[in-house]
């Protein structure tokens, strides 16, 4: 309830965040376990989208994953970010309503993200999307998904054991022209390494009193990962992914935003340095004097002007991936 109140207060300051333009729902189909569930995608599109789509225009797309510890949050939480994307980029913004724990623990959210990318690629002509120009963005838990989803998609596409993938799935139907190409990632204050305890993170943080409370982080972690057996998986802890997976599955252009007072600050900077060492073009911004989810402050009277500045800077990274020079896409 408190999370819902905070999210509502976040929508009050001017300029008002936009509502989604339309929602598209489709049945999931990748794994046998997920068959029959419905996934919703919330679209934010440019004003002249319908006219331009009918003329054959194909837009880049930013696929967004909201935060909330894999247990809370809605696909409209990042509407202010969507507004900036529409303002700064000639692109479509799609927010994924992925499955939440504890009803749907790992790997449901990751698989939903893969489903979303494949659906957008397969239906690209109808939706006015250029499937070769996809950007991923995510906040907190969604920042984790922005890395784990392309890695999971890569392993699905590369899998030699087709028994692991439902033969009626979207993967079995795609051709080379429908394979989604992720060209950039923007990850905001992501959780990246579940092998590190929350207590250790909190102790090592610069302002422990500013970090999320234990009761909340325990709820998040126990809901998403009821068993600790998966904490070393790269699809849970991307910081533990092998080099070859990071090199092949992730795009060249990556932006990360880490908050100085966040317990996730250290693992974020370490991961950014590792990616840079692997040859990725990484823009890692340290946001001084700010806690986790600083941009979602429930202040009903104003929005921190730094938020718009950072959102606008993130759009530069996305634009570089969509239209820039040099190698910028993952190998999936």
Locate the predicted segments by residue.
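An N-terminal hydrophobic leader/cap segment in hydrolases
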Residues: 1-33
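Alpha/beta-hydrolase superfamily serine-hydrolase fold, recognizing
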Residues: 17, 26-332
């Amino acid at each position: 309830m408190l999370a819902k109140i905070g999210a509502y207060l976040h929508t009050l300051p001017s300029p008002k965040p936009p509502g989604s333009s339309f929602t598209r729902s489709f049945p999931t189909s990748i794994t046998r376990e997920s068959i029959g569930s419905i996934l919703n995608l919330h679209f934010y599109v440019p004003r002249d989208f319908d006219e331009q789509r009918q003329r054959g225009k194909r837009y880049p797309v930013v696929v967004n994953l909201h935060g909330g510890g894999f247990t809370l949050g809605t696909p409209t939480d990042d509407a202010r970010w969507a507004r900036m994307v529409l303002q700064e980029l000639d692109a479509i913004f799609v927010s994924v309503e992925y499955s939440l724990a504890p009803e749907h623990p790992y790997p449901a959210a990751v698989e939903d993200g893969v489903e979303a990318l494949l659906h957008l690629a397969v239906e690209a002509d109808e939706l006015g999307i250029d499937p070769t120009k996809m950007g991923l963005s995510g906040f907190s838990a969604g920042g984790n998904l922005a890395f784990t989803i392309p890695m999971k998609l890569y392993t699905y596409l590369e899998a030699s054991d087709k028994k692991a993938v439902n033969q009626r799935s979207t993967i079995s139907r795609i051709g080379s022209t429908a394979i989604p190409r992720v060209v950039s990632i923007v990850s905001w204050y992501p959780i990246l390494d579940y092998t590190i305890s929350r207590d250790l993170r909190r102790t090592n943080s610069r302002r422990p009193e500013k970090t999320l409370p234990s009761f909340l982080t325990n709820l998040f972690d126990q809901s998403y990962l009821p068993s600790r057996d998966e904490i070393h998986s790269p699809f849970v802890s991307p910081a533990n992914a092998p080099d070859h997976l990071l090199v092949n599955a992730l795009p060249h252009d990556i932006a990360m935003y880490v908050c100085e007072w966040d317990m996730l600050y250290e693992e974020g900077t370490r991961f950014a340095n590792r990616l840079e060492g692997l040859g990725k073009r990484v823009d890692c911004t340290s946001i001084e004097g700010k806690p986790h989810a600083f941009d979602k402050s429930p202040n009903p009277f104003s929005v921190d002007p730094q938020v718009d500045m950072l959102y606008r800077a993130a759009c530069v990274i996305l634009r570089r991936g969509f239209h820039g020079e040099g190698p910028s896409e993952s190998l999936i």
